[in-house]
Amino acid sequence: AQADATANEVAERIGYITRVQSFCASHRLHSPTLVMNITNIKEHIEEVIPLDHKNLDKDVPYFANVNVAVYIXDNMVKQLPANLLYEVKIHETDKNIVVYRGE
């Protein structure tokens, strides 16, 4: 029953799938008005996402791309200041991407 409730809850959420074409250019990241230091964001991400270097098919069978985005977003909003997280973007490949905005 718990698994069915979780599956139904996730099924009602919206994920955006994007295909990306890329180009190469340069840009210097300099913004004294950043809302949060990038180092702090990295620390939060490492704490919330225990998925690094895992085989999601074998180690975490629950996940498909959209579910990974929902999992990360739900846990990141608990770590960050209110209304700071805009979206979570998962790159399956360079051209296949899932975007979750908490909707």
From Swiss-Prot:
UniProt GO molecular function: 6-pyruvoyltetrahydropterin synthase activity; metal ion binding
Active site: 53, 92
Keyword annotations from UniProtKB, A to Z: Acetylation, Lyase, Metal-binding, Tetrahydrobiopterin biosynthesis, Zinc
Positions where N-acetylalanine occurs in the chain: 1
Superkingdom classification of source: Eukaryota
Keyword flag Cell inner membrane: no
Pathway: Cofactor biosynthesis; tetrahydrobiopterin biosynthesis; tetrahydrobiopterin from 7,8-dihydroneopterin triphosphate: step 1/3
Annotated positions binding Zn(2+): 27
Record-level GO BP terms: tetrahydrobiopterin biosynthetic process
Reaction equations catalysed: 7,8-dihydroneopterin 3'-triphosphate = 6-pyruvoyl-5,6,7,8-tetrahydropterin + triphosphate + H(+)
One Pfam family, short name: PTPS
EC number: 4.2.3.12
Family per record: Belongs to the PTPS family.
Additional comment: Two isoforms of this protein have been found.
Biological role stated in the UniProt entry: Involved in the biosynthesis of tetrahydrobiopterin, an essential cofactor of aromatic amino acid hydroxylases. Catalyzes the transformation of 7,8-dihydroneopterin triphosphate into 6-pyruvoyl tetrahydropterin.
PANTHER family: 6-PYRUVOYL TETRAHYDROBIOPTERIN SYNTHASE, PYRUVOYL TETRAHYDROBIOPTERIN SYNTHASE
Official protein name in the record: 6-pyruvoyl tetrahydrobiopterin synthase
Source organism of the structure: Salmo salar (Atlantic salmon)
This protein's encoding gene: pts
